[in-house]
């Protein structure tokens, strides 16, 4: 049985929502065990609450060492100036021990993201995230154009061949659209299917 981890950081709930739909897609694949976890918050709780960060999230906090237990990891992060959020970077910067052991070599790595604006760095966030995964020897998986939501020209929408994305709006008021959530589910299903093949 393939084991898939959906691991995310979410400030205001947009990436959390995307993660939940990625889990839904992954769970639609028979013979796959799917786990949803988040990385630790690095902002002190009182300060985080004061700026509107969604501190209370149902997903348990992951540990670095457990990453080696999964056949595929789908990472989710909001964008910070075209890069992953500092909380995710801090977590990944602790994976040196896993790198030394080659613990993630051959495992699937996939990424999804959220930005405040339509051209706010979704693709650079995901592709720069890939650099870390490649250093770990992971096999990168995105979202193929077999996913029809990628070519939706009828609305402003996230979604790239590099991974599912959503647009939060500058004030965070926009929630993931139906199309964006469909792409997220597709990514989860696609990764889970490939993880099953690699694990067999």
Curated annotation (Swiss-Prot):
Residues at which NAD(+) binds: 12
Cellular component per GO, a single term: membrane
PROSITE patterns xref list: FLAVODOXIN_LIKE
Keywords: Flavoprotein, FMN, NAD, NADP, Nucleotide-binding, Oxidoreductase
Domain Flavodoxin-like: from-to ranges: 4-191
Name this protein carries in UniProt: NAD(P)H dehydrogenase (quinone)
Domain of life: Bacteria
Cross-referenced InterPro entries: Flavodoxin/NO_synth, Flavoprotein-like_sf, Flavoprotein_WrbA-like, FMN_Rdtase-like_dom, NQO
Keyword NADP on entry: yes
Cofactor binding, per record: Binds 1 FMN per monomer.
Residues at which substrate binds: 99
EC code: 1.6.5.2
Gene Ontology MF terms in the entry: flavin adenine dinucleotide binding; FMN binding; NAD binding; NADH:ubiquinone reductase (non-electrogenic) activity; NADP binding; NADPH dehydrogenase (quinone) activity
Binding site for FMN: 10-15, 79-81, 114-120, 135
Similarity section: Belongs to the WrbA family.
Needed cofactors: FMN
């Amino acid at each position: 049985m393939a084991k898939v981890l959906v691991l995310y950081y979410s400030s205001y709930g947009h990436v959390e929502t995307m993660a939940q739909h990625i889990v839904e897609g992954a769970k639609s694949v028979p013979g796959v065990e799917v786990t949803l976890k988040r990385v630790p918050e690095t902002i002190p709780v009182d300060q985080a609450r004061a700026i509107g960060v969604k501190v209370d999230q149902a997903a348990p906090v992951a540990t670095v060492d457990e990453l080696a237990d999964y056949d595929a990891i789908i990472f989710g992060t909001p964008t910070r100036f075209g890069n992953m959020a500092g909380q995710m970077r801090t977590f990944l910067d602790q994976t040196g021990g896993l790198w030394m052991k080659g613990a993630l070599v051959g495992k699937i790595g996939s990424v999804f993201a959220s930005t405040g604006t339509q051209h706010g760095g979704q693709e650079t966030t995901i592709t720069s995230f890939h650099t870390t995964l490649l250093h770990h020897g992971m096999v990168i998986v995105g979202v193929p154009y077999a996913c029809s939501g990628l070519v939706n020209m009828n609305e402003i929408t996230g979604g790239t061949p590099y991974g599912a994305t959503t647009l939060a709006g500058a004030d965070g008021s926009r929630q993931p659209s139906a199309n964006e959530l469909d792409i997220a589910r597709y990514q989860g299903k696609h990764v889970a299917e490939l993880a099953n093949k690699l694990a067999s």
